[in-house]
Each structure stands twice: as structure tokens, then as C-alpha cells.
Amino acid sequence: MEAKMTSRDRVKAAIHFKSPDRMPHFLPDGKENDILWLWQGGPSDIQNWHEENGHMLRTDCWGVVWETKGGGSYGEAISWPLADITTHTNYTFPDQNNPIYFEATVNQIIENNRSDNPKYCLGVMPFNSLNEGTHNVMGLENMFAAYYECPDDLKAFLSRLADKQKESIKILADAGCDGVMGYDDWGLQDRQMVSTSLIEEFFIPLYKSNWSYAHELGMDVWMHSCGYTVSLHALFARTGLNVIQMDQQENMGLEIIDAAAGGILAYWCPVDVQKTMVGGTIEDIDAYVKRMIETLGRHKGGLISMAYSSPDAVGHTTEKIAAMCEAFRKYERLGLE
């Protein structure tokens, strides 16, 4: 009898289209999951929430000043340390790659590797974003202007940030991660945030370098990217991305996504968080899961299940989350028998 796949092997088989024994899962239903999702710590805020002239403000470790008026935990950025990108050589990055912030990850991986069924260890890079990481410290409008007014300075800063990300990749490889994960939202609701030509000029060379480096170190590359991104999926796959994590699909269409990159890019997705999970019935959720597997998961793998990490914020009920989990488990071998 053929030995049962470990969770680690199952995830690798799914994302490389090598016929896993079932779809891998990362679900909040208390049953067996296949991924150990490892987030790192980081430096404290430069200044915690405090009242200043009637406003609640804080300054994060990147030097961004945030304001909140309603008592929320996030607030809105109101001041950026690199509003003028021509001053970027004076900017000092936070100490995100300090080994102390990886200690918990190292210990979890050691413990995981002792298991008879080790999970796939997915490490989130402390420097996990090139696009968002840049506009977070510049301000989005300032970054949009810099593409045209200060392209050389913008490229130089992105290169510095990419070098920090490469350090994160090496540390996570040394810790024993199977994959590394980044975050770059490239889409608005119905179109890309910027043109493909700008992404190709400013970001693809850096992605290619860092993703190739991760592959050389024996790891897969995962990236969260929401919004209307389907027009970029094949490009990202050719550049070296293995898995894209998307919380919405219906703004693009499952069949359109599959036609664009099915079989060359794997997908880590819940049921669409904006439409079916909000306005659909239990039966709609079941049908959507089945359809997702019959499209994105039909390539000897290619799909991993998950649930949205902040369900209360988007109005997902306990009943609908349970229905989604049940459907993913029910159809986990669909197309793989």
C-alpha cells in the first residue's frame, strides 16, 4: 500500500501540480490542516497611541504617523518619512531582520519536524512588500508621482528594500521554511493599480532576483495580492511566483483566472469574501467551492483551501464559515481520484 502523504508533501504536490492525495487545507474547523503559517515579530512603534492637540496619534517603526478618530486600532496614515523620495538615502529601515524576531519560528519548525506528519512551513517575510512597503512610507499619491518625476530615486529605494527582503529570505531558509510569503496588492476592484509596463520596469527585475534566490535556497514563493490582478498572473508565474493568495475571485471570474494561469500558478483561496460569503446561501457556498475546485484545482492540484482571517470585519457568519469548511473537506479529492 502506498504510504500516506505528509502534510508537507501534500502542499508541495499541490502547488507543483503533482497529484496530491487530496487538496491541502488551512481551515478554522478544528480538523487536520497542512500548513504552519509563520509570522515574525518586529520592532515596537516609535511612539504609541497618544493624544496630541485633540487627535490620537502613533508613529510606527517605519516612521509613519497614524491618526484615529474613532478609537480603532489602525487609523489613517497622515505623515510619511519619505514623502520626498529624493531623500531616500537618509532613510534607515527598521530592524525587522533582527534574529530575535525569528526565534519563535525556529522553535516551531524544530517541533514540527519531530512530528510523524510534518506540516508545510510557510514563513512570512518581515520585509514582505515592495509595492505596499514603498507607498506606506511615501504615501500613495507621492509614489504615483515618483514613477514619472523621480524614477531613478524610486528604483534606487526599491532596490534597497528588495535587498532587505532578500535578507529575510535567507534567514527564513536557514530556519527551515519550505516557502516564503510576501504581500503586494496590485489591483483595485475592477482594474490594476498601475499599468503592467510600470510593474515590469520597476518591480519585475526585483521580484525575479528575490524569487530566484528563494528557489535556489529550496523554497517556494507565495504572495498575497488582491483586487483585479488576473492580468498579472501569468507574468508573475513566469517571473517565479508559485502561489498567489487571493481573498476575492468573483471580480475577475474563476474561469477567466483559470484560463490566464491555471496549471502554472497555484491558488490559495477562500470562497470570495465580498460576494458569495456575504450574499450567498449555504447552498451557494457549497456550489462555489465545487466550481473553484473544478477550475483552479483541476490541474493535478493547484488549489489550497483557506478561510478569511478577519471574518467579522467583512460580515462572514459562523454558519457560512462552517459551510465553506465542510464543502472544502467534502470535495477535497474532486478531480484527483
Regions found by a protein language model. Name each.
Residues 33-108:
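Helix-coil boundary/capping segments in enzymes
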Residues 1-30, 59, 93-337:
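Active-site loop segments of alpha/beta catalytic cores
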